[in-house]
Amino acid sequence: MFALQAGISYDIFMYHKRPREQARHYDIQWHRQTGVFYPEQLSSETPTVGVSANTWREYMDLIRQAAADYPADHPADRFISPELMTTADIDLLEIPGQRDVVDDRLAKLEELSTSMPTAELVVGTPEYHPDGIYNSLVIIKNGTRRVLERKRTIFSSAEQGTFTASNTLQQQCTRTLSAVCADLVGYGMQYPQYPKLPQDTRAIHASCCWATPLEEGAHYAAAPDEERYTSTMTRALGRLFERYRQLRQVIVVDRTPPSTTIPPLNCVARRKTHNGIIES
């Protein structure tokens, strides 16, 4: 989750302006509705499918349909969910007491994954530990589950009261990095306290719940609206492509909660090419 909250040091006062530098670095294709979308793939990467849903029930309907349509001899696909998909219908502050619900939902996905054994389900979920709760991505394949990544950049006080920020990158030596929401902003920041992308990263798959106020009564710079919502995303993407010249593509799978009627910011951003040559 990425909160538009006043007082956070990521130049929120600039986000209402139309970004100009991004057009020089990347092209973007929007998928502004929930459902399944199939981005154009980088040739060397695992085929990726975005599964955008605003509720757990909607997500399960979509992923069950994907399983029913999935041919047994199909090459491996990676199905990406939004951030915290297993608790999409649960208030953020209630997540610490919902471990049984989360475990049950993950178990259902593990069972479902056996019907599509070569597929990888990347699911946003709380990860419960004695030392805290991580905002994590797990990867489920043929009935087994492992942690793929944990969120490293936590801006809002509401999230800080629920989740522990990870100080370790779980993925090492990977050309395609999975990221959780505000980590997109963190990776693009030019400050030492924010994490940096590994040098071999060529693509990012980001699971998001984007630009959403996280606590009642908070003093936000402004409530999310369509212009601010999209310009925040494009600014973050522009910083990534500017800072990391090796980065070729970013895929965002998003959801939005009931507090907004703005559709999700599912998108695929690719570094521009000139006469077939990728710009640097």
Indicate residue ranges for each PLM-predicted region.
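Structural motif
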Residues: 5, 78-80, 122, 178, ...
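Hydrophobic pocket-lining residues within nucleotide cofactor-binding pockets
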Residues: 8, 85, 154
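Active-site catalytic loop in hydrolytic enzyme cores
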Residues: 20-21, 28-30, 107, 128-203, ...
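Residue-level detector of flexible, active-site-proximal loop/helix-junction positions
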Residues: 10, 128, 153, 257, ...
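A structure-centric signal for secondary-structure junctions around beta-strands
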Residues: 2-3, 33, 75, 134, ...
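Active-site-proximal beta-strand elements of phosphoester/diester hydrolases
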Residues: 1-18, 23-59, 136, 148-150, ...
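Cys-nucleophile CN-hydrolase/nitrilase-fold catalytic domain and related Cys-dependent amidase chemistry
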Residues: 56-149, 211-249, 255-258
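C-terminal beta-strand edge segments of enzyme domains
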Residues: 13-30, 224-280
